[in-house]
């Protein structure tokens, strides 16, 4: 009996120690991985240009982060963050920590806003793609005014932003050459049957309504347009490398989404 009690005490002590150490680690790291990339920003690291305009009809802007001491006689490289939020929420400020981190490593970085579906405007993926492309044009013009030549870029994003980053990388419309793309938990194929949860969030009562919202078109056959806005369907032989990350569980993005993209890559 005494031996059993002693064993139980060891178990209790172990559990308490584990819980305390976990809480200490959480308090030290905060929201990982974002806490791990936090940068104490100052003029020695770079300069931030806030709320810069680019061509769009809805007043969207971008923020630009320029590292200190860049050599204007050499080619420079751009990383663009596109925020997530199920295409109906989020803002360019969501990318601040990432932009500061990559700027501290010597990359010109930017984070952009785009038209959201909750704003009650024409907010199709086609429009968002065009806005992202126009933002890149504005960034190129702005950095050239500053005396920098951006020779290549990598778009990145989370969830919805990852989709727009992939579309920018795969469709060949970026004025700055895209060398690779990286994203986390991004939709890759907008097959309506996969998106019942998003339809519920957006209060859509039919697959046709979903397709109309995503494409901005009121037509009967959406197959071609759904493919035209889906990264997995626009990957081709000229694809750039992609670094992708998906969780084992996701309350929003269906787990099969990564396989659509992987299968598309395996075709070429």
Task: Label the predicted regions.
Residues 29-73:
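N-terminal cap/lid segment of alpha/beta-hydrolase-fold proteins
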Residues 30-40, 167-220:
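Hydrolase active-site cap/lid region
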Residues 54-55, 90-99, 110-152:
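Catalytic nucleophile-loop/oxyanion-hole region of alpha/beta-hydrolase
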Residues 75-84:
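Short beta-strand element of the alpha/beta-hydrolase
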Residues 155-157, 184, 245:
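Short beta-strand immediately N-terminal to the catalytic nucleophile in serine-hydrolase-like folds
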Residues 157-167:
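Glycine-rich nucleophile elbow surrounding the catalytic serine of serine-hydrolase chemistry
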Residues 238, 244-246, 250:
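Short beta-strand/loop motif that positions the catalytic acidic residue
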Residues 251-260:
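Conserved alpha/beta-hydrolase "acid-adjacent" motif
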């Amino acid at each position: 009996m005494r031996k059993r009690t002693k064993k139980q005490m060891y178990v209790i002590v172990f559990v308490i120690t584990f819980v305390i150490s976990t809480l200490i680690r959480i308090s030290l790291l905060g929201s990982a991985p974002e806490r791990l990339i936090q940068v104490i920003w100052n003029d020695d690291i770079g300069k931030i240009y806030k709320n810069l305009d680019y061509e769009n009809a809805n007043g969207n802007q971008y923020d630009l982060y320029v590292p200190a001491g860049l050599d204007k006689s050499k080619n420079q490289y751009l990383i663009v963050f596109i925020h997530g939020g199920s295409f109906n929420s989020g803002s360019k400020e969501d990318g601040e920590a990432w932009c500061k981190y990559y700027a501290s490593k010597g990359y010109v970085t930017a984070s952009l806003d785009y038209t959201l579906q909750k704003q009650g405007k024409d907010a199709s993926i086609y429009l968002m793609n065009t806005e992202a492309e126009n933002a890149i044009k504005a960034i190129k013009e702005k950095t050239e005014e500053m005396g920098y030549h951006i020779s290549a870029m990598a778009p990145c994003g989370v969830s919805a932003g990852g989709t727009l980053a992939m579309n920018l990388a795969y469709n060949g419309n970026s004025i700055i050459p895209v060398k690779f793309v990286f994203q986390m938990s991004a939709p890759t194929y907008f097959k309506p049957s996969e998106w019942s949860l998003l339809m519920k969030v957006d209060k859509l009562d039919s697959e046709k309504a979903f397709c109309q919202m995503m494409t901005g078109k009121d037509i009967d056959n959406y197959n071609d347009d759904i493919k035209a806005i889906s990264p997995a369907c626009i990957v081709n032989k000229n694809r750039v490398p992609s670094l992708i990350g998906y969780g084992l569980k996701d309350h929003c993005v269906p787990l099969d989404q990564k396989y659509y993209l992987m299968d598309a890559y395996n075709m070429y």
